Amino acid sequence: MTGPVMRAVGITQFGGPDVLEIVERPVPEPGDGEVRIRVAAATVNPTDTALRSGRFRAPDGVEPPYVPGMELAGTVDAAPAESVFRPGDRVMAITSARTARGGAQAELVVVPADSVVAVPDGISLVAAATLPMNGLTARIALDLLALGPGQTLAVTGAAGAVGGYTIQLAKVAGLRVIADALPKDSELVRILGADVVVPRGQEVAAAIRLATGDGADGLVDAAVIGQEVLPAVRDGGHVIAVRTYRGETERSIKVTTAWVGDYLRARDKLADLARLAAAGWLTLRVARTLPAEFVAQAHALLEAGGVRGRLVLTF
């Protein structure tokens, strides 16, 4: 390898957390309309554990090591003259791990300018890193549902990062929210804004239906329950599957998968999320910070379950 190099999290083979390592990669050069960011913080998400384990196929045409990560925050390192950003600006961004450049978990990352927004004053870079991917996943889910004020939204996996943002964005939109929670998470989910909290578990669909009468108008399945959640939704309602959907449908219920990749360059959407976070409408939850060298521990913690908020790697 010639030229300047940087540190990055690398997946050289598929397997458990122990396959993760810190590797050297060439420093990426920004092209037209791109920004290079010196990463301060990048989150660990289920998409990263899926890539590492081989549950997600390897990126097409990309040789290992694969660099995971889809959301980050840091400072601008280089930007084109016509950009609104200048070196040193505090920013957050969403990116993809499915390119030759790799994902967010590296010292320096190049992304399209349309994937970057400023971090508002008063929000730390560690906290800001938890917003782009998870917040935009919640945003696209609600955009697909297109429910109006007063309608009822159900949320599974409500205590998680996507679920929490979904609740808070739904309340901004004037929706009535019914959300699931384990007993230890019930108070958290209420604080996030749920109007009704039902027990999480095998009977969650029945509990939601009981709370609504004839079922919710729409449901965001952040817990990835699949077909078993359909009884929670009214006839002709709409279910948004986060990441994947298992099963058939029934009673004219529409099922749509929310792909955050559709919002990779939705700068206006991300800027609106940043504005809501600065105003206190969105809660940025950091479960724990770890140096990038402890990425294997972060994966193990995430896969053990029970993480509330996001695990954040620091560089």
Name each model feature, range by range:
Residues M1-P4, K269-F315:
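C-terminal hydrophobic helical "lid"/dimerization subdomain
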Residues L131-R200:
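Mid-domain Rossmann-like dinucleotide-binding core that forms the NAD(H)/NADP(H) cofactor-binding site
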